[in-house]
Regions:
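Conserved catalytic cores of phosphodiester-cleaving nucleases, focusing on short active-site segments
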Residues: 17, 45-71
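Surface-exposed, flexible loop/turn segments at secondary-structure boundaries
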Residues: 32, 55, 67, 108-110
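Mg2+/Mn2+-dependent nuclease catalytic core
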Residues: 65-89
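Non-catalytic C-terminal interaction segments of nucleic acid-processing enzymes
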Residues: 1, 8, 16-25, 29, ...
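Short, surface-exposed loop/turn motifs that are enriched in glycine and acidic residues
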Residues: 3, 37, 75-79
Length: 153
């Protein structure tokens, strides 16, 4: 996916964190390609937020895809990340002690997706995810993030 689309979807995600409830702790710069050098933090999730009321931190990795496609198994789905990236997100979660969530936008535009899915990293062990599986994590488009039983919703 191209760089500009990714940034537009990250901006969409940031707008869902209402300032009265959420503090933005970090936004990944993703500048490795620009400086032609590896930057360790570029492999971290895109956004780190803290809930102001509960003082709980969450990391969010944003992935936009234009559509689902038919996979080798004959089911509609998408590849949300490469395996090595999933390992990096798992390591980040383990080392930092707070959960990583994956926000996937599908269809429409990166700034206004048709559908959105919010999935705990622990529920996405593989790079391929079927549409059927993702449906249980579907959230309303443009609905602000909230905390529910200490989970990001």
């Amino acid at each position: 996916m191209n760089y500009a689309k990714g940034h537009k979807f990250e901006k969409y995600a940031l707008d869902l964190f209402e300032p009265e409830y959420w503090e933005i702790e970090n936004i990944a710069a993703d500048i490795s390609s620009e400086i032609e050098r590896k930057v360790k933090s570029d492999s971290d999730p895109d956004i780190i937020v803290k809930n102001k009321q509960k003082n709980l931190k969450f990391a969010l990795e944003c992935k936009y895809r234009s559509d689902f496609f038919i996979g080798k198994n004959g089911k509609r789905g998408l590849v949300w990340a490469k395996d090595y990236k999933i390992g990096k997100y798992q390591k980040f979660e383990e080392e930092n002690g707070f959960p990583v969530y994956i926000l996937i936008g599908v269809g429409g535009f990166p700034s206004k997706p048709e559908r959105t899915f919010l999935i705990p990293l622990k529920a996405l062990n593989y790079s391929w995810a079927t549409e059927d599986y993702l449906q249980k994590f579907q959230i309303k488009v443009n609905e602000p993030f909230r905390l529910e039983n200490n989970y990001l919703k």
